[in-house]
């Protein structure tokens, strides 16, 4: 195992892909770092899977994936590998059916994060913002604040209820979602920076509505 790990690490170290990413002024070096750290974390979980505290590694992975979204969406492609490591550890007697189901579930999880959580949170916050400002007449950012208060309340209730009912999988899922959102919250820096009226303020994502357009890359138009 160590020999194969050393061979893989050395092959990547001296590969053209790695050095090209390392010397260019782009996001791919940091993206490679997060991909490596996330996969390292799932291997640490695999070592301690039978430990009562092994869940913390999965929660760490959720947080790192959330943070990595702010670097590059390419990091989400590590999710299928993570799911397969989980499958092979939890189900030693693997089958073709189980392998296929795990692959499908990994794609579904990837789609939920990519097309659901990432745009969904900002879109809902934007809808709340428009409603509470235009329909009710509250000050700017009121809708966004109310949305996140409700989101936090829903997460707290989910954690409390799942713990009370002894639903360990649901509790872990809600906890993973919480840490994914915490990691994803790095995008708030765009709003903070834009409201500071910096000299370079492309597309001015000053609120949830503008951030939604920014994340949707609407500034590039359609081809």
Regions found by a protein language model. Give the residues of each.
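Alpha-helical transmembrane segments
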Residues: 40-44, 83-87, 110-120, 151-165
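Alpha-helical transmembrane segments of multi-pass membrane proteins
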Residues: 25, 29-40, 58-61, 77-80
């Amino acid at each position: 195992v160590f020999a194969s790990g050393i061979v893989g690490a050395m092959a990547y170290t001296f590969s053209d892909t790695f050095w090209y990413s390392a010397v260019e002024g782009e996001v791919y070096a940091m993206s490679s770092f997060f991909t490596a750290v996330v996969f390292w974390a799932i291997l640490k979980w695999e070592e301690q899977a039978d430990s009562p505290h092994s869940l913390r590694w999965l929660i760490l992975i959720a947080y790192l994936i959330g943070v990595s979204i702010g670097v590059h969406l390419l990091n989400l492609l590590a999710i299928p590998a993570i799911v397969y490591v989980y499958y092979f550890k939890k189900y030693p007697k693997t089958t073709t059916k189980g392998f296929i189901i795990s692959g499908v579930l990994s794609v579904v999880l990837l789609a939920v994060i990519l097309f659901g959580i990432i745009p969904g949170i900002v879109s809902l916050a934007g809808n709340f913002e428009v409603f509470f400002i235009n329909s009710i007449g509250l000050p700017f950012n009121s809708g966004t604040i109310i949305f996140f208060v409700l989101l936090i309340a829903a997460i707290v209730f989910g954690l409390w209820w799942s713990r009370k009912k002894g639903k360990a999988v649901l509790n872990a899922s809600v906890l993973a979602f919480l840490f994914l959102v915490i990691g994803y919250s790095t995008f708030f820096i765009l709003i903070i920076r834009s409201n500071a009226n910096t000299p370079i303020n492309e597309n001015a994502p000053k609120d949830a509505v503008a951030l939604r357009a920014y994340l949707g890359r609407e500034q590039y138009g359609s081809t």
